[in-house]
Amino acid sequence: MAIQPWRKGKVIKIDDHTHNTRRFWIEVAELERFDFIPGQFVTLDLPIHEKVNKRWRSYSIASWPDGSNVFELLIVLAEGGLGTAYLFNEITVGSELTFRGAQGVFTLPGTIEKDIFLICTGTGIAPFRSMVNYL
């Protein structure tokens, strides 16, 4: 799988799901359609450290492919987490984020011939939400 290029996305909507959980909708204006497979993730490059590789934070895509250029992230505020603190305190509607993806292989098989069980906790539901809504 080829490494995806870094892209710019604009936050077009933010929803406080709970006191420490937010949904962020990100539009990729340079693309007519943002393609991904349910279960994949994006990596954000956040300005939280001077070393590049310490700025990267990966989050599963919570939305499902709908043919648009918008995707959704479901993020919980982690105590002491630099990335989530930045997202919760600095990012507003209209903010620009740098990201890479979609990437990852935690996806459904091409053909499902048996019942599948999806087990998770907390915001670990994000990739499963994408999968279930896609099915």
What function would you assign to each model-found segment?
Residues 2-95:
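Ferredoxin-reductase
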Residues 2-5, 51, 80-135:
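FNR/FR-type flavoprotein reductase catalytic core
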